[in-house]
Amino acid sequence: MDYGMYFFEHVTPYETLVRRMERVIASGKTPFQDYFLFESKGFGKVLILDKDVQSTERDEYIYHETLVHPAMLTHPEPKRVLIVGGGEGATLREVLKHPTVEKAVMVDIDGELVEVAKRHMPEWHQGAFDDPRAVLVIDDARAYLERTEERYDVVIIDLTDPVGEDNPARLLYTVEFYRLVKAHLNPGGVMGMQAGMILLTHHRVHPVVHRTVREAFRYVRSYKNHIPGFFLNFGFLLASDAFDPAAFSEGVIEARIRERNLALRHLTAPYLEAMFVLPKDLLEALEKETMVSTDQNPFYVTPEGEARQAPYKG
């Protein structure tokens, strides 16, 4: 009989993923969240935040390439980039692969977790925090944007989902926040973001985010990719007022990958463009969605995976 250690991740109250743990690397509680890092046979190191898997060593490159490069490659010359969240440093790592980048500002509220990543997760950041183009700001992203006058060519939003009615991240998923992001984009700028899992039990989460972003930007395009460490598809968004980010001109993405000499492990130009081809049921869900998340009534995700709205009382 196997008496090993196991981590149980409750996707909903009715579905659970079980992972065997080889050893515990680090665990603790910051002012913002609980963290737990363990070693597994299948996926290497696994980062848990508030009891949910956030990233795994073996496949993090799939998630981070999917998040970062569509936005970076649709922009002809991204020089200044803002990253909202992204505590492990892998989003920053991927942004800095683009030689056009002169400055990349990463704003994360949880400085303690960033230090955990620096110490225990070098496979993710790979020294990105030490790059002279990188600027790390420990602050609430909304407060930072309300205070700064800096503008960016690309903004990448890499946040945890707003799970739970008391989750302060809810205020980073509102139309007012997306308008604030847009106000800090240079002309021709683009926003890219993680936009929730695409799962039958969570069928409205991505459509609600998409519908909300549409209130702030002229062009909004969804795309998706399978993330093995999550055992499901994740949704992402590109948004811009200047151009349709999914209207790919033939050969442009491939040419930019070649010109920038990008060392990609997962994405190719054809695959990147194919991620924007969505199935009929998802297209219909995006078309039918009416919920818009606002500061007065921000949305949140219930333990069952439902999208709900309620005033934030935090």
UniProtKB/Swiss-Prot annotation:
Disruption phenotype: Cells lacking both speB and speE genes show defective growth at 70 degrees Celsius and significantly defective growth at 78 degrees Celsius. They accumulate agmatine and N1-aminopropylagmatine. Spermidine binds at H64, E88, D158, L159, T160, D161. Keywords: Cytoplasm, Polyamine biosynthesis, Transferase. Coiled coil: none annotated. Optimum pH is 8.5 at 60 degrees Celsius. GO terms for biological process: polyamine biosynthetic process; spermidine biosynthetic process. The keyword Transferase applies. One of its GO terms (molecular function) is thermospermine synthase activity. Its EC number is 2.5.1.104, 2.5.1.126, 2.5.1.79, 2.5.1.22. S-methyl-5'-thioadenosine binds at Q33, D108, D140, A141, P168. Optimum temperature is above 80 degrees Celsius. PROSITE patterns: PABS_1, PABS_2. One of its GO terms (cellular component) is cytoplasm. Residues 4-241 form the PABS domain. It is found in: Cytoplasm. In T.thermophilus, the biosynthetic pathways of spermidine operates via N1-aminopropylagmatine without the production of putrescine. Belongs to the spermidine/spermine synthase family. PANTHER family: THERMOSPERMINE SYNTHASE ACAULIS5 (PTHR43317:SF1). Homotetramer. This is Polyamine aminopropyltransferase. It comes from Thermus thermophilus (strain ATCC 27634 / DSM 579 / HB8). The gene is speE.
